[in-house]
Regions:
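Catalytic-domain carbohydrate-binding cleft regions of carbohydrate-active enzymes
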Residues: 1-264, 269
Length: 271
């Protein structure tokens, strides 16, 4: 069942979608059935987009909207995760919103980031905060989802595309996505270099699998803020532009057109 407004008609928060009432078991099973059709055709992962808000004037079967608002993402992702695991054997979704408990239903990505240096820096900060909140796996749109002011016709600068690809290589999951073409052949000047970084990514797959297993066992994220390894170092509590990728790689992305790291207080004595 779709949720309904106070007059009993189907309530849609968006022009192109209804919002499913996951507090109602029949609605949840109906949704799982739709996903099962896709999974039976060979789909291996469902993107649970949106889910970060609900409308307070809608009626839900099992909960008041003011209590459901944050919980909705958890119920939404749980349903998709469960049916995916039942059909494919692999427990995975590609989720945007999250609340406490959603770490049980990986993975999540950072949403619609701006294709700029600031957007890249903000994505990394968000990912590190996400890891500190208990989420082991996290991704982001490479090389950002949109530009400004041309939101829907975003052409990314080559240097941003290249540096964001490098950031993506050292992330738990990598995906190219945006409001315009993101395939590397649309960026011919840098496509050969992108290919080299992809080869490195595939070389790292055994390491990523090993670190992922450790993350599942321990709860530690793959992208680890420096304080994971250096909690006694006060400076590390303020560094949000580099991270450990698993236990063995210290990653410091370049996030400017000058192709350099710029921190006068760069701290490497104990790293």
């Amino acid at each position: 069942d779709l949720k309904q407004d106070s007059e009993g008609s189907n309530f849609s928060a968006l022009d192109y979608a209804g919002t499913i009432d996951f507090t109602y078991p029949k609605a949840t099973e109906w949704y799982k059935g739709l996903l099962k059709n896709l999974l039976d055709m060979g789909v291996t992962c469902i993107k649970t987009d949106f889910g970060e808000n609900i409308h307070m004037d809608a009626l839900y079967k099992g909960m008041k909207p003011e209590l459901l608002n944050n919980l909705y993402a958890l119920l939404y992702q749980k349903a998709a995760y469960e049916i995916t695991k039942d059909v494919t054997g692999d427990g995975i979704v590609w989720a945007r919103s999250a609340w406490a408990g959603c770490q049980r239903y990986p993975l999540h990505w950072g949403g619609d980031s701006c294709s700029s240096w600031d957007g890249m820096a903000g994505s990394l900060k968000g990912g590190l905060h996400f890891g500190l909140s208990g989420f082991a796996f996290w991704s982001h749109d490479v090389p950002g989802f949109h530009t400004l002011p041309n939101f829907m016709n975003s052409i990314v600068d080559d240097d941003v595309y290249m540096r964001w690809t490098q950031f993506g290589v050292f992330s738990s999951h990598i995906r190219y996505h945006g409001t315009n073409k993101r395939e590397p052949w649309h960026y011919p000047a840098i496509a050969p270099m992108i290919k080299k970084w992809w080869k490195l990514r595939y070389t790292l797959i055994p390491y990523i699998v090993e670190q992922s297993r450790k993350a599942i066992a321990s709860g530690a994220p793959l992208l680890q803020a420096l304080i994971f390894h250096h909690p006694e170092d006060k400076l590390c509590w303020h560094i949000d532009d580099e991270y450990y990728f698993g236990n063995d790689f210290l990653v410091a992305p370049v996030m400017n057109s000058e192709n350099r790291r710029d921190r006068s207080e760069e701290h490497t004595s104990e790293l």
